[in-house]
Amino acid sequence: MAKGLLVTYALWAVGGPAGLHHLYLGRDSHALLWMLTLGGGGLGWLWEFWKLPSFVAQANRAQGQRQSPRGVTPPLSPIRFAAQVIVGIYFGLVALISLSSMVNFYIVALPLAVGLGVLLVAAVGNQTSDFKNTLGSAFLTSPIFYGRPIAILPISVAASITAQRHRRYKALVASEPLSVRLYRLGLAYLAFTGPLAYSALCNTAATLSYVAETFGSFLNWFSFFPLLGRLMEFVLLLPYRIWRLLMGETGFNSSCFQEWAKLYEFVHSFQDEKRQLAYQVLGLSEGATNEEIHRSYQELVKVWHPDHNLDQTEEAQRHFLEIQAAYEVLSQPRKPWGSRR
């Protein structure tokens, strides 16, 4: 039966973040992706408003086809590639939170989770990719970064590149009953959310410990991009701040939010270390005045400006960027620990 555009828009408006419109159009992989990410964080759901006519046309065209295109490679899509990397990282973080206590986690569970996230995006719409090669790429990349939470990023990138290289159109299959499709989606949803819910409810301390370690690694990457670092810090600590605003000091007797307090202290200590590093870059002792910071910055910028060091351009460029980042860190007014909360 042909799919209707008005029905699709109605389902998009009513249950878009849960993927109801994709379920109606037979795009089960897309529906599962939206279920697990709440419509791509809401942004993907809104962006689809202009894409729904093409989705409906694609679904109706697939019903009239007797065989899938053979020997034809789908066009390369930068948006799909970026989504594969992001969802791979997302699946990896969920695995890090919920499955990190497993033996050989970094060898088995982490690359498997990241690879499945990449494959889920690869299977959106009428396309798919090679299952074995994509997972194989994830498993081969994982040992290189063994034991490091930041391994999620290179594993996701490697798996996404492999998935793009082996992209192809899906083979046409007979339509299945809705009950079978819902059963399959339900199992996949439970497999994703079950370990996460168990870890969050029964192992809060260990969960937040791994979250802190992971975000510490990411904050290290952003140490010379203070604006991005502060944004990451704000997102990480948002649940803590909201709970404190609503409940006050009395709401922190539970072990869960005592662990959030420890996590807050971790990020705070990380910012202290970043300021100490900035003092070292500018050649100052901790507690230097704003005038001393500004004077040292101006002197070092003149010394290490790339235009003044043509014989060692790369080294000068590196020092120049470090000096600018350190000055930006120290230029921000530092709030006392109590007021930051």
From Swiss-Prot:
It is a multi-pass membrane protein. Residues 277-341 form the J domain. The keyword Metal-binding does not apply. It holds the Pfam family TM2. Keywords: Chaperone, Membrane, Transmembrane, Transmembrane helix. PROSITE patterns: DNAJ_2. This is DnaJ homolog subfamily C member 22.
